[in-house]
């Protein structure tokens, strides 16, 4: 199995080089969150462009562990990295939005967490593109097949990228690749989380498990409760996977 995974890794590495050539770019950059998906992508882009790849760690009131795991990942992959703390910028934008909406008695407290977490993802996206534009690099996404199918990403946030090298990998395959690529044990063993708030986990937020999503994507039978959740997530996130609608005029 390891041999097959290595063959697939080599194929994706060559694909990454081809994408950069076709775009007339010079290299690749990725946001390193301290999680498994970004760790795999960081290792892949380092293999594709040893001298022209950059990891960017973008904490926004993030846990110390996430930052530590991001650094561990970069060091394990051997990829050059920078850290840009966006906590102050996030506070500035969030506070201004809340203040102005409150002035008009429009602020919806029930949507504050969604607003806050999506703002974090979009600030990171904007910053990644600022870095990429300066270096003439492409921004590489980290979403896997389970996340894309369920829409577990922020529109124009972590979903705002140039290329998606692991979009066809189910979550368990991401772990298999991570082991072959030498991703640190600390990252392999941590519970998947977007780090959006204290105690937040991917599976807790989605309402189902990656195991069941992977099995669903492979056409296997899963519990009815989880099937209902997955189908609802897919249906409600259709707008994230398509161009914005526009009317036909005339």
Swiss-Prot record:
UniProt cross-references to Pfam families, sorted A to Z: NAD_synthase
Enzyme class: ligase
Domain of life: Bacteria
Binding annotation for ATP: 31-38, 142, 171, 193
SUPFAM superfamilies: Adenine nucleotide alpha hydrolases-like
Chain residues that bind deamido-NAD(+): 122, 155, 162, 239-240
Binding site for Mg(2+): 37, 147
Molecular-function GO terms, alphabetical: ATP binding; glutaminase activity; metal ion binding; NAD+ synthase (glutamine-hydrolyzing) activity; NAD+ synthase activity
Reaction(s) catalysed (UniProt annotation): deamido-NAD(+) + NH4(+) + ATP = AMP + diphosphate + NAD(+) + H(+)
A cellular component term, taken from the record's GO annotations: cytoplasm
Record carries keyword Cell membrane: no
UniProt KW keywords: ATP-binding, Ligase, Magnesium, Metal-binding, NAD, Nucleotide-binding
Sequence similarity: Belongs to the NAD synthetase family.
NCBIfam families (UniProt xref): nadE
Designated name of the protein: NH(3)-dependent NAD(+) synthetase
Source organism: Alkaliphilus oremlandii (strain OhILAs) (Clostridium oremlandii (strain OhILAs))
